[in-house]
Amino acid sequence: MIKIKKGLNLPIAGRPEQVIYDGPAITEVALLGEEYVGMRPSMKIKEGEAVKKGQVLFEDKKNPGVVFTAPASGKIAAIHRGEKRVLQSVVIAVEGNDEIEFERYVPEALAKLSSEKVRRNLIQSGLWTALRTRPFSKIPAVDAEPFAIFVNAMDTNPLAADPTVIIKEAAEDFKRGLLVLSRLTERKIHVCKAAGADVPSENAANIETHEFGGPHPAGLSGTHIHFIEPVGANKTVWTINYQDVIAIGRLFVTGRLNTERVVALGGLQVNKPRLLRTVLGAKVSQLTAGELVDADNRVISGSVLNGAIAQGAHDYLGRYHNQISVIEEGRSKELFGWVAPQPDKYSITRTTLGHFLKNKLFKFTTAVNGGDRAMVPIGTYERVMPLDILPTLLLRDLIVGDTDSAQALGCLELDEEDLALCSFVCPGKYEYGPLLRKVLETIEKEG
């Protein structure tokens, strides 16, 4: 087992009950274009057109052959675009059960599938988009070969679901998905799970299971990659989430695209935090209807540390998100709040009484408790960064855009989620995720 000591389990109240309930009926689903790093769509549909589940909606011009398919059947209700015509979302009004069928195999044949057959079925069904590269967190090219594939079967994000609960009810599909991935490449398939977690595996020669323990970010793919198979400019690995592995297992046996998702609905603003069974790209406002405390709430697709606000054209469950988090907007001002002992406020430093209440869960809001200021290296980054890098120096390089130094310090190993804790504990109130993405884009473009 690999146990990390540095990190932070955010003591946030509103943790979901680890029991799966059926979610409400969903009448709108969408694909969010801005989730796919560097993607430039070539649209294959138009507004008002009827589509089947699994039908191609658009293709990536910059990554030919990579297609994005409909998560449900119905009609194209809207195609939202932002500045410079950036694709924000393709919305489908759900109707009927028409779907496209893909190649299917008897379970006994999965262990003998060729890499070409696996690749073709994943690409045509749109499940190829479940894979992401590291570095850069992009969908891999259809002819690319990874150095390894990392299956993330754990989650240490605040208010997250326990993956073992979800995997347990689909154990055979999960094992079949692993078997299919083992036929995609001869390289290692690293299945990463929490210490002692009951996660099934397959006996394929290239599948290895690893256990991780410790605080968040022990459950992030970036942490797994760093300790097992570090990447670099000339070494690429792929990552995939456990629910997508289940979907792959079902696809190859049934020939049907499975877009079911189990998400954790959590936060103190939720009346009954729990796990909900829904569909990929579900309209978040429908999922949360009647579920929230009547207040000024912020609904987030994903983690409170690194999720996206779910509203307007983005009011849909993200492709790579397994949770919906709800916290109150922090709009109120405190007079001389810094003088009070503040037992109800958490801080990683010893500036509040709440820091010393080790077993207490706190009500977090969107307030950042201060304005923008200079980056102050007081050791907070080092306390939450378990990777073998120099976080203060790296973060400073990200702020000034020094790509050469950032690359030397290990930025190619990272994704936005890997720096979310650094943003949370930053006294200067910097958001390091967008700064990292900007530097990565420059490195990819200029080398």
From Swiss-Prot:
GO terms for molecular function: oxidoreductase activity, acting on NAD(P)H, quinone or similar compound as acceptor. Keywords: Ion transport, NAD, Sodium, Sodium transport, Translocase, Transport, Ubiquinone. Its EC number is 7.2.1.1. Pfam families: NQRA_2nd (PF24836), NQRA_N (PF05896), NQRA_SLBB (PF11973). GO terms for biological process: sodium ion transport. It catalyses: a ubiquinone + n Na(+)(in) + NADH + H(+) = a ubiquinol + n Na(+)(out) + NAD(+). Belongs to the NqrA family. NQR complex catalyzes the reduction of ubiquinone-1 to ubiquinol by two successive reactions, coupled with the transport of Na(+) ions from the cytoplasm to the periplasm. NqrA to NqrE are probably involved in the second step, the conversion of ubisemiquinone to ubiquinol. PANTHER family: NA(+)-TRANSLOCATING NADH-QUINONE REDUCTASE SUBUNIT A. Composed of six subunits; NqrA, NqrB, NqrC, NqrD, NqrE and NqrF. This is Na(+)-translocating NADH-quinone reductase subunit A. The gene is nqrA.
